[in-house]
Regions:
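Short, charged helix-capping/linker segments at alpha-helix termini
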Residues: 3-4, 21-30, 40-58
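Internal acidic/polar
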Residues: 6-13, 90, 98-120, 124-125
Length: 188
């Protein structure tokens, strides 16, 4: 995450992106290394976790194609995560056009898979069920770790809108998880 007090050009990630734009392959590698965990995490939460690596690669392909136009008006990490968000949105639209079969639906759980796996799956499903604007704001701020101003820039909306979307996403998640627990087999 870009420190709040650094102008975009003084940020090491942005400096690496600008050097990569000028043709420095070592700077391009530094740029990818510095951002790959955030890009993958965003892709895993906004897209299909099984496709996160492919979505991250597509993000970098688009970013390096667009790098000549990058003017550093914002930080490079923010710019890159905005690209990743669009890549994930494109993937979701494509997936809706082509339904997939769930080949694991009838497989029994492996021994030792307990509540932790079920809770993690329930949380992932609850996040996936959020309204897309709320999910984006929640994932960017709570899972990727962007500040509210950075998330607002990625989403192209005011900071107050991000704050309200995150608050509503939290309320939706609490309500959705409580509802799942009450409707689970064997629940009280």
């Amino acid at each position: 995450m870009q420190p709040q007090n650094l102008p975009p050009r003084d940020d090491p990630v942005t400096a690496a992106a600008l050097a990569a734009r000028a043709g420095d392959p070592a700077a391009a590698a530094r740029f990818v290394r510095a951002t790959q965990a955030d890009v993958w995490r965003l892709c895993a939460h906004l897209g299909d976790p099984g496709e996160a690596q492919d979505l991250a690669q597509e993000t970098y392909l688009r970013a390096f194609r667009a790098l000549p136009a990058f003017a550093a008006r914002s930080g490079a990490r923010t710019w890159l995560l905005a690209i990743a968000r669009r890549v994930c949105a494109d993937a979701v639209r494509e997936r809706r056009r082509r339904p997939r079969l769930d080949l694991t639906a009838d497989l029994p759980d492996a021994p030792g898979q307990g509540a932790d796996l079920g809770d993690g799956l329930a949380l992932r499903q609850a996040v996936a069920a959020l309204h897309p604007d709320r999910r984006d704001a929640f994932v960017l701020t709570q899972l990727v770790g962007l500040s509210y101003p950075e998330a607002a820039e990625v989403c192209g909306c005011p900071i107050g809108t991000i704050r309200s979307r995150v608050a509503r996403a939290r309320a939706d998640l609490v309500g959705g998880l409580a509802e799942r627990r009450l409707s689970a087999p064997g629940a009280g």
